[in-house]
UniProtKB/Swiss-Prot annotation:
Organism phylogeny: Bacteria, Bacillati, Bacillota, Clostridia, Eubacteriales
Catalytic reaction annotation: S-adenosyl-L-homocysteine + H2O + H(+) = S-inosyl-L-homocysteine + NH4(+); S-methyl-5'-thioadenosine + H2O + H(+) = S-methyl-5'-thioinosine + NH4(+)
Organism: Desulfitobacterium hafniense (strain Y51)
Protein name: 5-methylthioadenosine/S-adenosylhomocysteine deaminase
Binding, substrate: 95, 147, 185, 215, 300
Entry note: cofactor: Binds 1 zinc ion per subunit.
Cofactor(s) demanded: Zn(2+)
């Protein structure tokens, strides 16, 4: 039994008015026992460790609802291109040369970057997902993993079988830190018959589906030419939306598409920086939220972003909508919800995303004793419009400290950086 008492400014994300300037959090093993003002600890709570962070804001760990972690291997390899030329001429040829070991090291680099920027949970889609699971288990983070499935590719059936094995071997692994979904890539890379088989297996195994949807105007045009419908309408017709589905991007949605998403309770992973960099467009996030659609926030991969800083992603999410929809669009607290509690809902995780009794002890501290955080009129505004990855001081998952005073505790990051540099350059030289 391990008991920890944290003293800090506490933003629990349980409501817009909930903030404890002199707060306390009590943790026993992997769970939160209490959260409140100074003096909240019951007399019976005798901590084994006290962590005093009087100038830090402690909040739930950030949740990245859509990424391709091992694409750290491709960071800065292919820039300044639209989506399809980027994929077809640069990304896919590079990925074809990546080994299982490359994916392991690339994922470990991503996890180190995520921890250092306050992300405790990710939804990942890639290949060699057993290697991704290995990296997640070693790093101590939380991960929802999906094997990327390009149904139209020669290895489509093998990848499908790998996703089934991933569920059987890793769903619930690491004391529940790993969950698994199916990962059909997109409507334009999977046939209707393939998608229906994916849906059938997901239902049989009791897991969700993670898919790119309506990312570009070219995708809309392609699907309309093939099926006479928008991607969202076609996926609904196929029956894909019957269970827990996370749809990434969702940039180009008609009013009917948005209503379909709401009626089917589809969860959306919003990736504003990737959408801007690839010139994909601006997703109708305020409209979707007003219909009751739950929207999480994601970075996408590092070759279309090019980092995994969820603080930067929050700022971009807010600024992009304000530019297009008006200054009142997506207030700071709503963006924080997308990166925490709504991110957890998007991934189907019911015991993370807020700091409250009974929830997992997944939390981060941000060092507010810095010039850019003064004066402190609004903590949520500072977190969204000011904070960046380098402000994160402490990271905890399942009650275990993964970073303290910015020092990673579970990853030898210098070794990982050297290994990724060597491997990535070797692949690029062979192309």
């Amino acid at each position: 039994m391990s008991k920890i008492l944290i003293r800090a400014m506490v933003l629990p994300m349980t409501g817009p008015e909930d903030f404890y300037p002199e707060g306390e959090i009590g943790i026993e093993n992997d769970r939160i026992l209490f959260v409140g003002e100074k003096g909240s600890a019951p007399d019976s709570f005798i901590p084994d460790q006290i962590i005093d962070l009087p100038e830090d804001v402690v909040m739930p760990g950030l949740i990245n609802t859509h990424t391709h972690a091992a694409m750290t291997m491709l960071r800065s390899y292919a820039d300044d291109l639209p989506l399809m030329p980027w994929l077809q001429t640069k990304i896919w040829p590079f990925e074809d040369k990546m080994s299982d070991e490359d994916i392991y090291w690339g994922t470990l680099l991503a996890l180190g970057e995520m921890i250092q920027s306050g992300t405790t949970t990710m939804l990942d889609m890639y290949a060699s997902m057993d290697q991704v699971a290995k990296a997640v288990l070693e790093a101590g983070t939380r991960g929802v993993l999906s094997r990327g499935l390009i149904g139209n590719a020669p290895n489509g059936e093998r990848a499908f079988a790998e996703n089934i094995d991933l569920v059987k071997n890793y769903h619930g692994a690491g004391q529940g830190r790993i969950q698994v979904m199916f990962g059909p890539h997109a409507p334009y890379t999977c046939s209707g018959e393939f998608l229906q088989r994916v849906k059938q297996e997901a239902d049989r195994l009791g897991v969700g589906i993670h898919i790119h949807v309506a990312e570009t105007e070219d995708e809309i045009k392609t699907i309309k030419e093939q099926y006479g419908k928008t991607p969202v309408q076609w996926l609904e017709e196929l029956g894909l939306f019957g269970g827990h589905v996370v749809a990434a991007h969702c940039v180009h949605l008609t009013e009917e598409d948005q209503e379909i998403m709401a009626q089917n309770k589809v969860f959306i992973a919003h990736n504003p920086e990737s959408n801007m960099k690839l010139n994909s467009g601006t997703a109708p996030i305020p409209e979707l939220r007003s219909r009751g659609v739950v929207v999480g926030l994601g970075t996408d991969g590092t070759s279309s972003n090019n980092n995994l800083d969820m603080f930067g992603e929050m700022r971009s999410a807010a600024f992009q909508q304000k530019l297009v929809k008006g200054a009142t669009a997506l207030p700071a607290y709503e963006v924080l919800q997308m990166a925490t509690v709504d991110g957890a809902r998007t991934l189907g995780l019911h015991d993370v995303g807020v700091l409250a009794p009974g929830y997992k002890a997944d939390l981060i501290s941000i060092n507010f004793d810095q010039p850019h955080f003064y004066p402190r009129f609004s903590i949520p505004a500072h977190l969204v419009y000011v904070a960046h990855a380098g402000d994160v001081r402490t990271v905890m998952v399942d009650g275990k400290i993964l970073m303290q005073e910015r020092q990673l505790m579970t990853i030898d990051i210098k070794r990982v950086c050297r290994e990724v540099e060597k491997r990535a350059k070797g692949i690029a030289q062979g192309l």
